[in-house]
Amino acid sequence: MKSQFKANVLAILLVSLFLINGLVFLSKTLFKLFNFRVTHSLNNYYTFNLLIKAWRSIKNDFSSLNNFVFFIERQVHNFIGLLIEQPSIEEDNQPEVIEETPKLEIVVVIEKEVINSKLSDYFCFFKYRSLFFELR
C-alpha cells in the first residue's frame, strides 16, 4: 500500500513538473511578445513563430511525459508478470491431472460437417447453373 502511494505521489510530481516547465516557457514567450509589442510594431511572423515555439515546447513536454508513463506501465506489467509466473509451493505439491477426452473425434465430425456444407453449396451452384444461363 505504501509503495502504491509513493508511486502515485511520484507520478503527480512528474506531471506537475512537466506542466510547470511548459507554462514557464509559455510565460517567457508571451512576455517577450508583449515587450516587443510595446517597443516596436507587432510583426505577425514573429508572434506566429513565438507561439509555434511555445506550442512545440508544450507538445514535447507532453510527449516525453507520455513516453515516461508508457515506460513505467511496461515495467509494472513486466514485474506483475514475473510475480504471476513464479509457481507457489502449494501448486508444486499437487499432482498433475491429465484428462483424456475424445477431442479428436469431435473435431473430425465438425470438419466433416463443414466440408459437406461446402460441397452441397458447390453442387447447388451446378444444379442451378442451367437456370442461371436461361435467365440471361
Swiss-Prot record:
Protein's membrane topology: Single-pass membrane protein
Highest rank taxon of the organism: Bacteria
Pfam families registered for this protein in UniProt: DUF5426
Keywords: Membrane, Transmembrane, Transmembrane helix
Main location: membrane
Protein's name according to its UniProt entry: Uncharacterized protein MG441 homolog
Residue spans crossing the bilayer: 7-27
GO cellular component: membrane
Location in or out of the cell: Membrane
